[in-house]
Amino acid sequence: MFGHVFSRRTSFLVRCFHVAKKFSNPEPEDILFSALCLNLRQRRWNTLHQFSSSLTNPLISRVLREFRSSPKLALEFYNWVLRSNTVAKSENRFEASCVMIHLLVGSRRFDDALSIMANLMSVEGEKLSPLHVLSGLIRSYQACGSSPDVFDSLVRACTQNGDAQGAYEVIEQTRAEGFCVSVHALNNFMGCLLNVNEIDRFWKVYKEMDSLGYVENVNTFNLVIYSFCKESKLFEALSVFYRMLKCGVWPNVVSFNMMIDGACKTGDMRFALQLLGKMGMMSGNFVSPNAVTYNSVINGFCKAGRLDLAERIRGDMVKSGVDCNERTYGALVDAYGRAGSSDEALRLCDEMTSKGLVVNTVIYNSIVYWLFMEGDIEGAMSVLRDMNSKNMQIDRFTQAIVVRGLCRNGYVKEAVEFQRQISEKKLVEDIVCHNTLMHHFVRDKKLACADQILGSMLVQGLSLDAISFGTLIDGYLKEGKLERALEIYDGMIKMNKTSNLVIYNSIVNGLSKRGMAGAAEAVVNAMEIKDIVTYNTLLNESLKTGNVEEADDILSKMQKQDGEKSVSLVTFNIMINHLCKFGSYEKAKEVLKFMVERGVVPDSITYGTLITSFSKHRSQEKVVELHDYLILQGVTPHEHIYLSIVRPLLDRENGRP
């Protein structure tokens, strides 16, 4: 009886304790937290807006963690906070972002997590370093009950941004903090190294894998195969394939596609076909060709001009049940256009449409380009009109193809009008087409028109480059208008644009032709980088004016800059030409022997200059002797000079009429 009473009293006391707890004063943040959660569950955004000024990052993070089992709703809240809360838009946003990343990775919403990471590290976003993001993720790791997958995701975010160094730093720091990224993250990093052409670094990381406790998977082997194929080492790639089989790792279709594409790019179509035919046998009948496989082979044959074989592979592709796609048709359309069969290319486009495929901008560009190359202006413009009628958005390649095509065929006025329409509609903002128009106006000696193009570029706010200025500078220099050329150059410098070697060489050439050798040499001395064209220009002008001493000095400078490599065939031809003009024939012959000794092979210009000069001022025997010497050095004779000068001498020597 007493036990029963005691039990009831205990129960009563416990109930009293809970009631007391229930009616105790809760913390203000707890009240706000409960209100936020209640309204968030019912998506009452207008009501939530009333609390925005009271939000703190710890509170935001707490709400996000509360909804870890509802990641979609948590993400909606996170995005709402970013749009409406001033606190979260400051540097304090970072804490909530890290919590959100943990929740998204935990719920396998990797794309959303990667998007937040990319925004944190982008110039448009917070512009945080990968290591800064990593530190935030590590701080919130425990509270969010996260997994190492979050570090894999950060590595992937870096590699997607092309930041190989950032990915490396994350991997190293993660290891230093007692965590470890998976082999998938390491594969991502190594793939990024290959994409940015850091081949040596790729091999270094690959060789360290085993010592770090990683086991290669099929993706690792595929990367190694890709690396060898990238360097056209097909035999080594095949060796890796067989090593993969010995390790008990079965290949996938990517393994074969890497090798087949590598073979096609090196032109080894026989090897590509062998791999295509043996895919089943080499994979234990687990792998069969897909659209990528067939497209690689079709593209390879198209590049080789073997359209018959490309069509045969397309037939095999259809028979095997693999549908042709835009890439299949794109390769064939381009190949038929290159072969001058535009009608067949257009027929393929109709076939595409009948199969429900879209003729994309790339394919249209290809057709327009080859029609212009054939000189079929009306056909090209008709295809362009068809693009417009189908609301197909033209890109900068379309614009460049049309402008160049019209200019190339003499329709410069039409090209200007087309460019004007593009600029007015603001469809594409690209300086390449403006530069093309300037080039053609300069070539046609319409410098005032070229000036107008430059002016319109400035009005449109386009960022001019060295080609824009260089084209106009070269045009004015060729017309002998040195002062105007220098005005444009000064304008370029005032706009903080960097000159290049081509512009400097044009100015040096212009000054030299005006007899301003001193000024030309001063420009050369001020140039940080000089090339063979720079020196050849000075050398030519020095020899033209008979200043042999100055020419000798220039030749010495050339040799000092880069040894004998800097003295090219053009240099020797300039020297031989001027020595012959000054009557120094034996000296010219010495220069010839000097160039041969240094491994520079004479060409038909060398042959023509020497044979013509020797035929006028030396005996017939000397001419024939010189001809024989040049032939022995591997020179192909200048046809006209050989037939008109040397052949008659040889016939006379052999007693022929």
UniProtKB/Swiss-Prot annotation:
Top-level taxon: Eukaryota
Assigned keywords, A-Z: Mitochondrion, Repeat, Transit peptide
Main location: mitochondrion
Statement: the UniProt record of this protein carries the keyword Mitochondrion: yes
GO terms for cellular component: mitochondrion
PPR repeat start-end pairs: 147-181, 182-216, 217-251, 252-282, 290-324, 325-359, 360-394, 395-429, 430-464, 465-499, 500-530, 531-565, 568-602, 603-637
Transit peptide: 1-74
Protein name: Pentatricopeptide repeat-containing protein At1g11710, mitochondrial
The species this protein was found in: Arabidopsis thaliana (Mouse-ear cress)
